[in-house]
């Protein structure tokens, strides 16, 4: 049973009805648990649902950004589902960026890598290179270096370090707000959406999961940005729970659209 739920209106102002779709998994043959990328490789009958999901993504009102969750337990095929939807989204002309936080560790490395990875992918496209540069510099304002309380010992490291310090201080003077406004303008001027996919979130440590969601909240309301986050709801809710506040409450404040995938029966997974 697939459950697709949305809390926001489409770009046309119409609320899309919630729906569920049943698929019979009893007669499936043994399959590999490696993620698929092509519709022809879909043996779980998820192609149709993934295409419906992609169409909904394309209809979203993204003037203030939006965050979408693809939720399911380990082995439910979240990555494959996103890959199938990705093809439909790409064919509509949207840019898709990927960030896998599992490849990095620690709060500072996650922050730095998040902005660096996204900006690097943007710079590969001529029409997005300026946005990539601005996003990279925006990210540097949140790295540890940008908030060093003193600079004295750095002076001894030479002129290169002095230039770096001057650059950092200038960014601080300009302020996060000013840099953010530049990015928002560039995104609006693009007049098309950018999709950012974050996978394997549930493989992170508790502190890293919290850091990732802080990063998402930091940039979630950028115009024309769609986040697609794939994770195990139970694991992430557990990580986000703190001081008696349920993690589900935290998630509901972030996610505007969710799709819940059922677990794949063990008899259809390769041994």
State where each predicted segment sits.
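Conserved small helical "lid"/interfacial subdomain of P-loop NTPases
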Residues: 255-271
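Conserved nucleotide-binding/hydrolysis micro-motifs of P-loop NTPases
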Residues: 74-75, 103-107, 232-237, 263-268
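Short glycine-/polar-rich loops that comprise or flank the Walker A/P-loop
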Residues: 92-96, 192-193, 222-226, 250-257
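P-loop NTPase nucleotide-binding core
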Residues: 82-189
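Conserved AAA+ ATPase "sensor/coupling" helix adjacent to the nucleotide-binding pocket
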Residues: 118, 243, 271
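Conserved Walker B catalytic segment
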Residues: 175-232, 238, 242-245
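Walker A/P-loop-proximal flanking segment of P-loop NTPase domains
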Residues: 1-104, 112, 219
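Extended hydrophobic secondary-structure segments that form protein cores and membrane-embedded regions
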Residues: 67-75, 97-101, 196-203, 228-231, ...
């Amino acid at each position: 049973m697939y459950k697709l739920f949305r809390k926001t209106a489409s770009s046309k102002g119409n609320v899309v009805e919630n729906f569920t779709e049943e698929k019979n998994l009893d007669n499936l043959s043994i399959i590999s648990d490696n993620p698929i990328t092509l519709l022809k490789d879909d043996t779980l009958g998820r192609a149709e649902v993934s295409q419906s999901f992609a169409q909904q993504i394309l209809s979203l009102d993204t003037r203030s950004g939006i965050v979408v969750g693809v939720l399911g337990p380990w082995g439910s095929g979240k990555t494959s589902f996103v890959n199938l939807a990705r093809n439909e989204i790409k064919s509509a002309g949207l840019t898709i960026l990927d960030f896998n936080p599992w490849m990095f560790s620690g709060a500072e490395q996650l922050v730095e890598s998040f902005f660096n990875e996204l900006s690097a992918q943007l710079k590969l496209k001529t029409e997005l290179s300026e946005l990539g540069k601005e996003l990279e510099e925006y990210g540097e304002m949140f790295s540890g270096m940008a908030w060093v309380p003193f600079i004295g010992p750095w002076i001894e490291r030479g002129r290169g370090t002095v230039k770096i310090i001057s650059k950092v201080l200038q960014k601080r003077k300009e302020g996060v707000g000013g840099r953010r406004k530049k990015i928002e303008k560039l995104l609006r001027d693009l007049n098309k959406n950018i999709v950012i996919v974050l996978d394997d979130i549930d493989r992170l440590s508790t502190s890293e999961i919290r850091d990732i969601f802080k990063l998402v909240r930091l940039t979630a309301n950028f115009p024309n940005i769609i986040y697609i986050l794939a994770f195990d709801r139970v694991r992430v809710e557990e990580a986000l729970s703190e001081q008696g506040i349920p993690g589900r409450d935290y998630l509901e404040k972030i996610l505007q659209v969710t799709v819940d995938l059922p677990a794949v029966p063990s008899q259809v997974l390769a041994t």
